[in-house]
Amino acid sequence: MTMLFGFCASSSVIADETQNAKQARRIFNHTYDMVFGPQGSTLQYNVNIIGVMKVKGKIWYKGKKKRYEESRYLSWSDGVKYSRVDMKKKTVTLFDANNPNKDKYESKFTFNPLDFDYYVEDGGSDFIVTLNAHKKAKCNIKHAKAIIDKKTRAPKSLKIKVLWFWTSINISHFKSGDISDELFTFPATKYKDYTWIDNRLKK
């Protein structure tokens, strides 16, 4: 489910934005940098894709590196190779890290920050940042609402409308920084008895 946290934010300033929109974009970008910046981060998530699936797990980021753990699936990506373990089928599948086919949902969550209008509301101890896609936007995400802690700027929840369905993500145990590179090294010997499938492009 890593695609749910793969937003591509931008610090670009839109000349005709309102003050509220500029503030909303700054808040969103600050939190994005806490999650996806070079210092790395980790969080726990509980995802509900309405009418499709529910899943919870833990994820780590650091630059182009990524790792997650769920009840059935585990994955490690060191920025070059992506390794996914299916605990039920006892398989290890390898992909190039930049292959969009490594996750069947990933292509549905395309996001361009310039395709949205931003708006922020006061939610008491939180900021409520709403993103609405422009009518001519090509991305699949049409609406998004992020709940961000005012004091820590940590993400608390995210609600996304993709095409016709809604996805809700509750976030907890967020930490930014102090993420070791060793976390993203795939422990191949641990799964040596599994069936291995290599889907990397051959050179």
PLM-predicted stretches and their roles:
Residues 37, 59-67, 76-82, 123-124, ...:
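Short, solvent-exposed coil/turn segments at beta-strand boundaries
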Residues 13-20, 123-125, 135-144, 151-203:
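Non-transmembrane domains of secretory- and envelope-associated proteins
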Residues 44-48, 67-71, 129-136, 157-161:
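Short beta-strand segments that buttress and anchor functional surface loops
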Residues 9-53, 60, 64-65, 189-203:
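N-terminal leader/targeting segments and the immediate start of mature chains
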Residues 58-105, 165-168:
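An acidic-aromatic
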Residues 83-138:
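Surface-exposed, polar helix/loop patches in the mature regions of secreted/periplasmic/lumenal proteins
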Residues 1-7:
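Bacterial N-terminal signal peptides
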Residues 50-52, 75-76, 136-140:
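Short glycine/serine/proline-enriched coil/turn segments at secondary-structure junctions
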